[in-house]
């Protein structure tokens, strides 16, 4: 190689190095900017969690029926944190009026119902056998909800979904499936606002708007209400006429995001008449549910809705708070 050619090669090599360094610096800056933007989007509390979910769903086009097919990524920040902070209280019973869901019959006539069994939700329930209500808050969210329903139905069970009213139109087909297949749809307010912080009129509006949103799809309003975060005071209780159902087994799935932890909590704490709190927004909760369901059935538990559980444990009274339905 001549001296001139070697000089040209050296100049080109220096130019390539400079270009490579510039490209690397650009990439680092881009990643850093993206990380900073994401960091700014990290929720600072339960209320902002729900707003973040909605923004991400809107950005991905999930505010229509196509949203039923979206991936779970980006939807795993939610408004359930305060729900895990609600401490278990003694059950407040109220048997002075039964407002439980009417029993849904199977296609077979009453004459074909096995002795001692009750037809409900497309299958038979033994009123004298142990039963548990699995409940899932903050949905609907079809990628997880459909997995839960698939598994529950496979094992002859039904569950309860406490839905947020402003989400139901995004997942109409999931809501329709819940209703058609005998699962229960509960009211988790319209916007997941903490009702103990609101005035009487807005409390009533939050509950009624969710009732209307569900009824517009199914033709029937939810029968029970679950308070966001479990928060209540005298104003809340005075302005909700429906039965209020909280929980006595809390998986803390919003916090752990760990299926094994949720499974262990349920299997260690569950009893006949328990109401279990989980959340529909998390893949880990779906993973836990498909393990919990067969495990409970193997232990002899029937998986029933909240209203079914109440029906066989003394009924429900409007405006009364329930944590479980133990005998």
Regions found by a protein language model. Give the residues of each.
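Short, solvent-exposed mixed-charge patches
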Residues: 326-327
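Ser/Thr/Gly/Pro-rich low-complexity, disordered linker/stalk segments of secreted
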Residues: 54-119
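Sec-dependent signal peptide cleavage junction
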Residues: 32-49
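Catalytic domains of cell-wall/extracellular-matrix polysaccharide-remodeling enzymes
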Residues: 147, 180, 193-323
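Intrinsically disordered, low-complexity regions enriched in serine, threonine, proline
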Residues: 10, 52-53
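N-terminal Lys/Arg-rich, disordered targeting/topogenic segments
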Residues: 1-14
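Active-site beta->alpha N-cap acidic-glycine motif
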Residues: 107-198, 202-203, 213
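Sec-dependent N-terminal signal peptides
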Residues: 17-28, 33
């Amino acid at each position: 190689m001549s001296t001139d050619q070697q000089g040209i090669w050296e100049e080109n090599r220096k130019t390539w190095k400079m270009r490579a360094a510039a490209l690397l610096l650009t990439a680092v800056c881009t990643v850093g900017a993206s990380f900073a933007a994401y960091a700014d989007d990290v929720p600072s509390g339960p209320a902002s969690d729900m707003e973040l979910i909605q923004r991400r769903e809107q950005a991905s086009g999930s505010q229509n029926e196509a949203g039923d097919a979206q991936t779970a990524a980006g939807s795993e920040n939610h408004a359930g944190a305060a729900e895990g902070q609600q401490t278990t209280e003694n059950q407040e019973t109220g048997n002075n009026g039964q407002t439980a869901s009417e029993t849904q019959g199977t296609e077979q006539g009453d004459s074909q119902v096995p002795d001692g069994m009750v037809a409900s939700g497309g299958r038979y329930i033994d009123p004298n056998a142990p039963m548990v209500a699995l409940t899932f808050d903050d949905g609907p969210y079809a990628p997880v909800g459909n997995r839960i329903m698939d598994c529950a139905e496979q094992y002859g069970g039904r569950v309860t979904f406490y839905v947020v009213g402003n989400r139901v139109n995004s997942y109409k087909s999931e809501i329709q499936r819940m209703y058609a297949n005998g699962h229960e749809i509960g009211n988790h307010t319209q916007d997941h606002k903490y009702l103990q912080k609101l005035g009487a009129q807005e409390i009533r509006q939050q509950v009624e708007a969710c009732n209307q949103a569900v009824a517009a799809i199914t033709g029937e309003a939810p029968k029970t209400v679950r308070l966001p975060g479990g928060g209540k005071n005298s104003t809340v209780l005075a302005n909700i006429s429906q039965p209020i159902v909280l929980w006595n087994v809390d998986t803390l799935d919003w916090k752990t995001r760990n299926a094994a932890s949720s499974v262990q909590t349920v299997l260690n704490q569950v009893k006949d008449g328990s109401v279990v709190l989980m959340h529909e927004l998390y893949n880990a909760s779906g993973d836990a549910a498909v393990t919990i369901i067969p495990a409970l059935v193997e232990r002899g538990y029937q998986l029933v809705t909240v209203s079914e559980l109440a029906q066989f444990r003394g009924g429900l009274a409007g405006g009364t708070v329930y944590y479980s339905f133990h005998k």
